[in-house]
Amino acid sequence: MKKIFFTLSLIFTLIVFAGCGEKKQPLKIYSIIHEEETKALTDLFTKRTGIPVVFLRASTGELVNRVIAEKNDPQADILLGGATNYHIQANKAGALESYKSPLAEKVPPYAKSADDTYTGFCVLTLGIGINKGRFESKFPGKKYPATWDDLLDPAFKGEIVLTNPVASSTAYLFVQNQLQRLGEEKGWDYLLKLAPLVGQFPDSGSAPAKLLGTGEYAVGVSYLHAVAKYGADGFDVATIAPPETVGDVDCIAIMKNSKNLDAAKKFVDFMLSAEAQELMSSIDFTIPVNPDAKGAKGSIPVSKLDLIDYDVAKAAEQKESVLSKWSLNVK
């Protein structure tokens, strides 16, 4: 269905622009970020440049696997979104093009690759989300979990929602958060104690925030900005930034052998601009990477977070073995 949607969207775009005086080849994007953000950003890009855009929105795992499989004949020009370890994976497979944007100098070193194959455009921080009404109904008088270890309370069994790390970069980041803060042995002990308490492992990284917002679960592991957005929209949720959490960045990359390289470079430049990052923050409460961009009211500055020294390269190297172990041990 998604492939059909992408194809039909492309055909529709080509038909529309066939009648224009100047024909421009549409930029094709695989997007991991939310559809609302993707549409707003691509609409603004088209307005600023006149370059038409078509996009396919799907989960991180699905799109990164597609990028790698298509590396010799890419069906898109841009991979938009996804944590750094997934871009490292695609780069190691030879699927990404090197491009240093003029705006890359504004991006801090932790948010870009040394070889200019991927660049971060917003900071993502993992935390705990609470549906206040459901929590207080299920656990009257109980304090909200304030640390990662608090989630191991047996009372929470069935009331926790955590994304499936095999399908989602959000949950894989959580898995690595525990392995890196506790060490391999204690980290796996933690994860295997937590798993039986989880009521649902959806595939989409955005699902926990949504399920918390609708009151289907009391506690969830999610990016803080995703839960904060539901709070701003009037849902009965709270965000908690536990100590020793982890931060990462959503990245953008150009496909190796892109058929529309000039337009792809312009889109990377656009995504690193203050204008694009402020637009994204206004929609989804993400924290801009560009220091000239202002984050939306309600977004949590990086300076106020207790972050571990996250080893991105290690997370990427271990990905296959860690997910294999997860699949074997978590049913």
Language model features by range: what are they?
Residues 16-19:
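C-terminal motif of bacterial Sec signal peptides marking the signal peptidase cleavage site
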Residues 21-23:
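Bacterial signal peptide processing site
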Residues 28, 32-39, 61, 75-216:
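Extracytoplasmic ligand-binding site segments that recognize negatively charged/polar headgroups
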Residues 32-54, 128, 230:
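Short, polar/charged alpha-helical segment
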Residues 85-89, 213, 217-236, 284:
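A ligand-binding cleft/hinge motif common to bilobed small-molecule-binding domains
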Residues 124, 156-163, 190-195, 201-202, 233-258, 271-293, ...:
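Periplasmic-binding protein-like
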Residues 129-134, 249-260, 279-280:
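A bilobed periplasmic-binding-protein/Venus flytrap-type ligand-binding module shared by bacterial periplasmic
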